[in-house]
Amino acid sequence: MKVIYEDNHIIIVNKQAGEIVQGDKTGDRTLADDVKAYIKEKYAKPGDVFLGVVHRLDRPVSGVVVFARTSKALSRLNDMFRTGKIQKTYQAIVPATEKSVATPDGEWITVDTWLTRNECQNKAFSHQREVAGSKRAALDYRIIGRGDRYNLLEVRLHTGRHHQIRCQLSSLGMPIKGDLKYGSPRSNPDGSISLHACHIAFEHPVSHQVIDVTADYPDNKLWLALGGGNK
């Protein structure tokens, strides 16, 4: 666990792929557990440490995660996420497609579809029009790096649906590298998928100063070759 920013009200860390943010049926130790232990030791906190989970990243995804250290910060951050006042940026490595060859570098493309969720499969499905049980999902992406076989995309969400980036990119014929669930032909050696929450910016919930942080990239040559983090 790497701490990117901390103060009395919030703490921001760089989650590694494979870590879970909050407890699930596996019973595995969580990132929240590690952050609590860090706070307890660093500040010699007696008893239980308060830590509010504000948002999550899927287990195979890496990058920025924000936690609240006070109930005031948690309540306000929850409102900010709900009303779209948090700016999150992701980068993803996807296969280079014939269509992408004709797409100019840096040109933003909007994907606006409807997603349904299959709880049994823990998987989302994209639909071009509204269907029963679906929720609207929108994102923008652009190509910021190219290679012979893969492209590097920057992605910004307008909505925060379950597996949204993974599902919508896959529906365009661009499954994220290593994401077997959404059509990648093979897994990454470490079990990760090549999706990184690289940046977050928002107004501090208490001090109102601008918080603007970037998470270091996974130690992977392909990220470096495609220019991850340099755009």
Where are these regions (language model features)?
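RNA pseudouridine synthases
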Residues: 1-231
